[in-house]
């Protein structure tokens, strides 16, 4: 970052896009350059990912949503068990920000994997590049959903351009990293 004349700020995508928190007072061009630097870093990380999206209104209550999320995570683990078993430990980074997500993750992982094979870590983005990568991936997938529903924001348009540009420059690249 320093070589590019950019501040060394941990990535937190929503404040970056909206100019809040550590990015307050920073011009849009510098924030775009930071986004691009983070995105370049992401593309060079040896990671695979999968995202899920849910409309809370599609579920009669939180318990139904937790059950569905747990099922989806368990199926993802079982579908990729051979790959996951190559590792001594599966590290789960999450900041416990949303009870429903925390409960679903713990229930699914504890059901699908041996407890001695799992390590839970606080996924505070400022402490881990991996958490920053996850934040960026989730933001990009959410942006794709907004484009699909034609509810993208002016901020989305400013940072990513039209859907075709977003798809070519961001979405296709992160989807090559799907597990």
For the regions a protein language model found, what residue spans apply to each?
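Phosphate-ester processing/binding pockets and catalytic centers
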Residues: 1-179
């Amino acid at each position: 970052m320093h070589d590019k004349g950019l501040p060394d700020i941990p990535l937190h995508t929503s404040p970056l896009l909206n100019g809040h928190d550590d990015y307050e007072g920073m011009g849009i061009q510098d924030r775009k350059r930071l986004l691009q630097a983070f995105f370049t870093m992401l593309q060079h990380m040896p990671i695979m990912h999968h995202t899920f999206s849910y409309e809370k209104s599609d579920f009669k209550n939180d318990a139904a949503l937790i059950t569905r999320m747990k099922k989806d995570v368990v199926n993802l683990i079982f579908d990729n068990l051979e790959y996951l078993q190559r590792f001594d430990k599966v590290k789960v980074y999450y900041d416990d920000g949303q009870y429903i997500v925390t409960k679903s993750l713990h229930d699914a992982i504890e059901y699908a994997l041996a407890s001695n094979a799992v390590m839970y870590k606080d996924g505070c983005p400022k402490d881990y590049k991996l958490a920053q990568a996850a934040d960026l991936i989730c933001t990009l997938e959410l942006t794709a959903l907004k484009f699909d529903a034609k509810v993208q924001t002016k901020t989305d348009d400013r940072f990513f351009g039209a859907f075709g540009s977003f798809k070519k420059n961001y979405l296709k690249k992160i989807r090559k990293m799907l597990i």
